[in-house]
Amino acid sequence: MRGDSFIWSLATAIPLLSTAVESLKVVKRDNPSVLGFDIERFQAAKPVHRDIIAKRASTKTISQDLDNQKNLYFCNLTLGTPPQTIRAHIDTGSSDLWVNTAESRFCSSRRAPCSQGGTYDSSSSSTYQLVNNDFNISYVDGSGATGDYVTDVINVGGIKLKDFQFAIGHTSSSPLGVLGIGYEAGEAQVTRSGDQSYPNLPAALVKAGHIRSNAYSLWLNDLSASRGQILFGGIDTGKFQGKLQTVPVLHTSRGDYTSLVVALTGVGIRTGSDGSIDTFPSQPVAVAMDSGSSLSYLPDALAAKVYNSVDAVFDPANNLAFVPCSMANDKRKLVFTFSSPQIAVGMDELVIDLGPDANGNEATFRDGSKACVFGIAPAGSSISILGDTVLRSAYLVYDLDNNEISIAPTRFNSTETNIMEIGTGENSVPDATGVPNAVTSAQVTQATGLPGVETGVPGSRPPSSKAAGQAKRPDFVLGVAAVGLAGAGMLFAAM
């Protein structure tokens, strides 16, 4: 993030809801073992740029900043004795907490870019201990963070953990640190150095007895909402419709679970009032369910079919598609299927307003209509990702103990709350059912280009003669505007 942007603050300790999944026991208790945070929005800048950069990363472990095109999702926490306040991105796609230090070249620059996120000073903490110097997360362009693994006291959501391991970024290029909550096997010291894993935040909460299972639920709410919610060790049945349906997380060819990846078995568009869906032909695709990615990334051929269905125009210079901003009022929905459960995503969640550039100019098409980014991008040779443009329309339960993800349609802006605790074991629960014969393997992304999709240099063609709502090329170069799009993207742990 560079400049102003929307940030979501996960700050308040509240009773949390347990996510129900096939192998989890969900229990209604008067005092559930759940840790929860409200997710609050804060103005942030350039939510798309680092998504674009990060997609070029060459390493295998994903780490993300939780930007959702306009929004970052972050939590307030403290580290050390006495406490030092930090804002860190909540990220299901990575596994380490890392924070900046004020002495880094990036943070000590004249613009003081790290003042918003806060920094950690190990010399000011009486409980600091050095672990090793193996921390290294990097972007493909050489940016990222390197430094030390340390232990210290952490306080998050009113819960204090002693001797908690995290990383200090002595060299970094991000003004905000990252709170990764993925698999321990995805930690940078494991993937880079082959060292043993350590208990990251969800695992440490289990170890300390604050929650019963290494599982959490995520409710991002809609694009314009001021609050969402994450619950460690619980679910909130007031935040989703119907029943949770559980699908397996896919493992690597070695049988390891390192990323929260499931099989996407279908993508289509719902066009009629009868609810019928026109499905785009495709084989099952392995997709990361990654709240840290602003955009969603599909295999090139599948992205091309989506673009053609909504008359989007692709800009290869920025790896983005554009549509008229008026498409946000379109009633069609993209539908994503996972063996059985579906996420139906409205156009109002997929059409992203760029806002003005540094000179106050807004992107427009040659006919004068305002141009917006479409929230689906081609994955190229990288893994496919369902980011915030899709995940906002779902209620998700990430069960790392049982290697499952449960999915239900979200209830946008719901004020209803019903907290349930996630227990342990393999008993089925009323709020979640396993999907029979769920797909357990899927192909990885292959770069094929975008056959049949209209492309071109901005301003290179006249206004389209097609039906109203078709995207036309913006009439000024979008390189600057697109930089303002990219906010936080995915980090890849260096291998």
Swiss-Prot record:
Listed Pfam families: Asp (PF00026)
Catalytic residues (UniProt): 91, 290
Location of this chain's protein in the cell: Cell membrane
UniProt topology in membrane: Lipid-anchor; GPI-anchor
Family the entry assigns: Belongs to the peptidase A1 family.
Glycosylation site list: 76, 136, 413
Region of interest (Disordered), ranges: 448-470
Record's protein name: Probable aspartic-type endopeptidase OPSB
Cellular component, GO, one term: side of membrane
Gene Ontology biological process terms from the UniProt entry: proteolysis
Highest taxon in the source lineage: Eukaryota
Lineage, broadest ranks: Eukaryota, Fungi, Dikarya, Ascomycota, Pezizomycotina
Gene Ontology MF term list: aspartic-type endopeptidase activity
